[in-house]
Amino acid sequence: MPISKRKNESDSESEGENKELVDVDFEFFGPAQIDYLAVKRLLNQLFSGDAGEFQVEKLTELILEQPGIGSTVKTDGIDSDPYAILTVLNVNINRDHPSIKAITKYLLEKVPKGSPAGSALNDILSPQVLAASSGHTGLIISERLINMPPQIMPPMYRMLGDELTNATNQNEPYRFDNYIVISRCFRFDDNEESATGISQPAKRQKRKGGLLRSYHAEDEYIEKVALAKAEYEYTNRIERDEDSFGVDLAGRVIIFPQSKFDTFVSLIEAGFPTGRS
């Protein structure tokens, strides 16, 4: 899939910039054992300071043990490192896996039980529901390097939907009623926002005096079909000095129903067209 990316070249003779469009061909491959280290790095990035709580090594192995489910994005052939991954895990089937148990416990503790997201999580992650033979929940794992364009996400989600359909047609355990998406966000305080020169989006949230922004641009579209969502502080977050400059990181969880999966894919296909620009 060719996508045009802008490459900025500084002009040493002036303060201006010449902008050149560079076409990058992204290739999609199923997750494979050769991707172990790169996928583990992406998971560490996704879970940020709390990654150590989830036995990321075992979670990586679980992801790579699923044939035919999920995709990675590479630019230099199948043997190169992936720059992005999208997959889904059956929380019910894997409820006793150490990583899934840790993630389930973590989310139930992080999100207030009385909130809409807390109620939704309790409805689908209680021990009785997890042990049921139907009404399963899929944990969507989605992460990419920060410079990867969101235009890679529509085909990845479209392929994931097709893979899940094929799997359920073969009676494999990928029939879900709901999905949980774990994501990341960050915030500046108002003074830092002005200092960066970043234009403020039309839709924004105030959180502890700062502007909440998404690392994953597609979160905006997932929220349109979501049952509930919540942001939470990392347990092992890095504290900044009062005068230090940077961003505060936070976690995000979004719950949406299977009935809205195709609607969500259509939204991101319209929001992130993959044609050359």
Task: Name these PLM-found stretches.
Residues P2-S277:
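Intrinsically disordered, low-complexity, positively biased terminal segments
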